[in-house]
UniProtKB/Swiss-Prot annotation:
Its EC number is 2.7.10.1. Keywords: ATP-binding, Cell membrane, Disulfide bond, Glycoprotein, Immunity, Immunoglobulin domain, Inflammatory response, Innate immunity, Kinase, Membrane, Nucleotide-binding, Phosphoprotein, Receptor, Repeat, Signal, Transferase, Transmembrane, Transmembrane helix, Tyrosine-protein kinase, Ubl conjugation. Glycans are attached at N98, N101, N154, N163, N244, N286, N298, N361, N424, N455. Residues 799-821 are annotated as: Activation loop. It is a single-pass type I membrane protein. It comes from Danio rerio (Zebrafish). GO terms for biological process: cell migration; cell surface receptor protein tyrosine kinase signaling pathway; developmental pigmentation; immune response in brain or nervous system; inflammatory response; innate immune response; lipid metabolic process; macrophage chemotaxis. Present in an inactive conformation in the absence of bound ligand. CSF1 binding leads to dimerization and activation by autophosphorylation on tyrosine residues. The gene is csf1r. The lineage of its organism: Eukaryota, Metazoa, Chordata, Craniata, Vertebrata. This is Macrophage colony-stimulating factor 1 receptor. The juxtamembrane domain functions as autoinhibitory region. Phosphorylation of tyrosine residues in this region leads to a conformation change and activation of the kinase.
Length: 977
């Protein structure tokens, strides 16, 4: 209809312009009809004349070169010598597009006795879709040919149902083609009694698709965290190439997907991969993959959920036949119970485990676990439950970021059993256990009897008030009723306990008098008083016993200078630190304390498979308290949390499974800095004496020998062996093991100390403490005894709380229920129990005094008593140590500033010492030796402080929160003393 309308419009336009159809004639004259018949080799000249510019449209495009070049109202088509190829229809049209519907045509037959049919010079293979029409250009060169037929090339007739129309001027028209028509065909006709055939036409009909493409998504839902990468694969296939795949989202545009095409038998498979590099909350919704072909479209949809945080959600799934209230389940003996839990989790679960009352047994209940995308179902099958199997059943699950658990409490219906007990002269108690909770009734019968007969008038309920209370015991509920009777009574009582399951009873005969009551009451009272006093004394002694704890603390700043300590037990432990216990060979003990010890060990395969490394191993004693084991695990977690640094004793591994906890750290062969300084004191003095004009210092080290054995050191560990880890001299004449890791070799240190060494020790410790401060870690026990030395005299910070006998170490003073290194502590730590990085700076200043006095104890000749606390509170500072340059003493005084905010940072301290290290090669310290102030001098300095209101106060304060009456205590949130 539409094309007919266009044709009419074209005619009307031509009429409006006054044009008529162009006219075709032969050069020799007018046409006799619409056909022109020529012999092969004859000339052909057609002339077209119209009302405007015209041109010819020949059958073959290559014949356009025979059209005259001039453009005008008259055009000619001229061929000097024709062939059968010129057979066809020639059309004359206006060149103006508006007049394309005005045309004329003529058909030319070029006869040749050898050729009856002409065909296009292009391919004779025709491909059509099922249901379309197909025109085969099988043209006759002679209109007088007869007996035209159309058949297969093999001689068979055309297929049944083929609708054929033949026009000698156009060819064979096949309507509504079908895949059954696929074959090779020829046209046949007779001329002069002989049959002639055309070239072979090959027909290939593509079957019409009756079904949309197959579309498949592996998952019907996805869960992702914000920022994660999403990749969805959509698998499709189709019988041919004529289809496409698209992606759509319920609310937003999606990026272009990548496609991979393969052949699967006779079908084409396209895998479309949609990738979103970083999902956002707005991506939440339905994502659809659609495959479309001529038969229609097919799609598959998946749901995407984008969340901000990981999650684990647990919900119980219990049979409706079970009697339960929430997670509490009531069963009878011999029942079967299925405990089901529905789990939703992302990231995916990494582990799941049931904990049952019989987990210690070799045979556990049957459990099943099902997984579908990010949803799971855990099922525990309990068959024929008995009394030993009742209790709590807990499912623990975790993924890479969270953990969760759910607990079912199974209780078994139990018939009650009653037991009567004589508490004292006038009191009886009846206890019964059962489930549900039993009820108790008392009955009496006169006289002394073994039983009271039932259903008689002698058995009477006791009209007295009873007190009942419930308590859980092994899944059953315990009920106790107390009966009070008067003196001078002879009676038999019956206690009856009953519940839904049944009842139980017990009979008791009693004879009460006042004399028995008085003596029994007095004896019971005395015994209870003695036991109470003994219990109070034992609790006091137990609380006085110190517990092992790592001094290091991780903090987080909240508001200004207010800090909150992070519970180290909540820090994660990375299993990558686990080291095989069988590859660790323990050696001699390097140090031992009240809670544990440090031993030398050899680790095989640490770092690299063929490495043999000397290490130090921390462990607890066999009698260690569970709290102390948790403290060692906290130390392990803190060390793994901090990471590696050259100036701390670094964690190398740990053994936490299959035995006691072992913490593997670097081995520092030269022991602690305090004893190293003392052992090198004489050499240092000799070195100082060689400096021209250096006055002989009046020190306590004139008679120090390098071979001296320290029976008791400030480190707090008794030692008689020269190579003990804490109270040690440098290792001498140790056999060399070529198989050991070179980093673990210990060379004898025979070099004397010099000023550069003291400055380097100070700088390295400052760098280590700066690293700890950057990690929000407070050391709380900075002292020379807690610094170890490795090869090349590299200082490393450690914590010897495990292997130090603080009970017998004079450096640790009792305050409240703890022992603290008071002489190294900042005022705010002593008086307010506040520990910050600035309090570590104060302790570092004390450690500098130790270094530059070659290991002397700070505040010499001053006892830790009320006077000492008063001196500290009033700002007393030690004088410059024997060998400290003035610049270093300035740093010490900066560290001892009473205002914690005014103390320098470790980074600043490190920079100042580094500058001094650069100047020591050009300068010599000529400062004269200064004696340590005596206690009298300290008192004189104290008097200048003029304390007004603290003269009579005791400074033996405690950090225990219960002792709030102490005048120097201030309430705070940092009670770690």
């Amino acid at each position: 209809m539409f094309f007919a309308l266009l044709f009419l419009i074209g005619i009307l336009l031509g009429q409006v312009q006054g044009w008529s159809e162009p006219r075709i004639r032969l050069s020799s004259g007018a046409l006799a009809g619409t056909d022109v018949i020529l012999e092969s080799g004859s000339p052909l000249q057609l002339v077209c004349e119209g009302d405007g510019p015209v041109t010819f449209l020949p059958r073959l495009a290559k014949h356009k070169r025979y059209i005259s070049k001039e453009v005008g109202k008259i055009r000619s088509f001229r061929v000097e010598k024709t062939t059968v190829d010129f057979t066809g229809t020639y059309k004359c049209v206006y060149m103006n597009g508006n007049d394309s519907n005005l045309s004329s045509s003529v058909h030319v037959f070029v006869r040749d006795s050898r050729v009856l049919f002409v065909s296009p010079s292009t391919s004779l293979r025709y491909v059509r879709k099922e249901g379309e029409d197909l025109l085969l250009p099988c043209l006759l060169t002679d209109p007088e040919a007869t007996d035209f037929t159309f058949r297969m090339d093999n001689g068979s007739a055309a297929p049944y149902g083929m609708n054929i129309t033949y026009d000698p001027r156009k060819g064979v028209l096949i309507r509504n083609v079908h895949p059954g028509f696929n074959a090779d065909y020829i046209c046949c006709a007779r001329i002069g009694g002989a049959e002639k055939v055309s070239k072979i036409f090959s027909i290939n009909i593509i079957q019409r698709l009756r079904f949309p493409p197959y579309v498949y998504l592996k998952r019907n839902e996805y869960v992702k965290l914000v920022g994660e990468r999403l990749q969805i694969s959509c698998t499709t296939n189709n019988p041919n190439f004529y289809y496409n795949v698209t992606w759509t989202h319920s609310s937003r545009m999606l990026p272009k997907a990548e496609e991979k095409s393969t052949m699967e038998g006779d079908r084409l498979a396209i895998e479309s991969i949609l990738t979103i590099p970083s999902v956002q909350l707005s991506h939440t919704g339905n994502i659809t993959c659609t495959g479309q072909n001529e038969a229609g479209a097919n799609s598959s949809t998946t749901q995407l959920l984008v969340v901000e945080e990981p999650y684990i959600r647990l919900s119980p799934k219990l049979s409706s036949k079970l009697t339960h209230r929430g997670l509490s389940i009531e069963v009878s003996e011999g029942d079967d119970v299925d405990l089901g839990v529905l789990i939703e989790a992302y990231p995916p679960l990494t582990s799941h485990k049931w904990e049952t009352p019989t987990s210690h047994n070799a045979s556990l209940p049957e459990n099943r676990f099902f997984n579908h995308n990010d949803r799971y179902e855990a099922l525990l099958l309990l068959k024929r439950l008995n009394f030993e199997e009742i209790g709590q059943y807990t499912l623990n699950v975790k993924n890479s970021m969270k953990s969760a658990s759910i607990t079912f409490d199974i209780k078994m219906y139990t018939k009650p059993v009653a037991r009567v007990k004589w508490e004292n002269v006038t009191t009886l108690s009846c206890r019964s256990y059962g489930y549900p909770a039993p009820s108790i009734l008392w009955y009496q019968c006169t006289g002394i009897r073994t039983t009271c007969p039932e259903n008689t008038t002698d058995l009477q309920p006791i009209q007295t008030q009873t007190v009942e209370f419930q308590k859980e015991s092994f899944g059953a509920v315990g009920v106790e009723s107390v009966l009070t009777v008067g003196p001078n009574r002879r009676m038999t009582v019956v206690c009856v306990a009953f519940n839904l399951v049944g009842q139980g009873s017990d009979t008791f005969s009693m004879e009460v008098s006042d004399q028995i009551f008085t003596s029994a009451m007095c004896g019971s009272t005395v015994a209870m008083v003695v036991l109470g006093l003994l219990l109070i004394f034992m609790i006091y002694k137990y609380k006085q016993k110190p517990r092992y704890e790592i001094r290091w603390k991780i903090i987080e700043a909240t508001n200004g200078n207010n800090y909150t300590f992070i519970d180290p037990t909540q820090l994660p432990y990375n299993e990558k630190w686990e080291f095989p216990r069988d590859k660790l060979k323990l050696g001699k003990t390097l140090g031992a304390g009240a809670f544990g010890k440090v031993v030398e060990a050899t680790a095989y395969g640490l770092g690299k498979e063929d490495n043999i490394t000397r290490v130090a191993v921390k462990m607890l004693k066999a009698s260690a308290h569970p709290d102390e084991r948790e403290a060692l695990m906290s130390e392990l977690k803190i060390l793994s949390h901090l990471g590696q640094h050259k100036n701390i004793v670094n964690l190398l591994g740990a053994c936490t499974h299959g035995g006691p906890v072992l913490v593997i750290t670097e081995y520092c062969c030269h022991g602690d800095l305090l004893n190293f300084l003392r052992s090198k004191a004489e050499n240092f003095l000799n070195f100082v004496m060689t400096i021209p004009n250096f006055p002989e210092p009046m020190t306590d080290y004139k008679n120090v020998s390098t071979e001296r054995m320290f029976v008791r050191s400030d480190s707090g560990i008794s030692s008689t062996c020269s190579d003990h880890y804490l109270d040690m001299r440098p290792v001498t004449s140790r056999p060399t093991n070529s198989a050991l890791d070179s980093s673990s070799e210990c060379q004898e240190d025979s070099w004397p100390l010099d000023m550069d060494d003291l400055l380097r020790f100070s700088s390295q410790v400052a760098q280590g403490l700066d690293f700890l401060a950057a990690k929000n870690c407070i050391h709380r026990d900075v002292a020379a005894r807690n610094v170890l030395l490795t090869n090349s005299r590299v200082a490393k910070i450690c914590d010897f709380g495990l292997a130090r006998d603080i009970m017998n170490d004079s450096n640790y003073v009792v305050k409240g229920n703890a022992r603290l290194p008071v002489k190294w502590m900042a005022p705010e730590s002593i008086f307010e129990c506040v520990y910050t990085v600035q309090s570590d700076v104060w302790s570092y200043g004390i450690m500098l005094w130790e270094i530059f006095s070659l290991g002397k104890s700070p505040y010499p000749n001053i006892l830790v008593d009320s006077k000492f606390y008063k001196m500290i509170k009033c700002g007393y500072q030690m004088s410059r140590p024997d060998f400290a340059p003035p610049e270093m003493y300035t740093i010490m005084k900066m560290c001892w500033n009473l205002d914690a905010a005014e103390r320098p940072t470790f980074s600043k301290i490190s920079q100042m010492i580094q500058r001094m290290l650069g100047e020591t090669s050009e300068q010599q310290d000529t400062q004269e030796y200064k004696n340590i102030p005596t206690e009298a001098e300290a008192e004189q300095q104290l008097e200048s402080c003029d304390p007004v209101k603290h003269e009579d106060e005791s400074f033996e304060t405690s950090c225990d929160q219960e002792e709030e009456d102490q005048p120097l205590m201030k309430p705070n949130n940092y009670q770690f003393c």
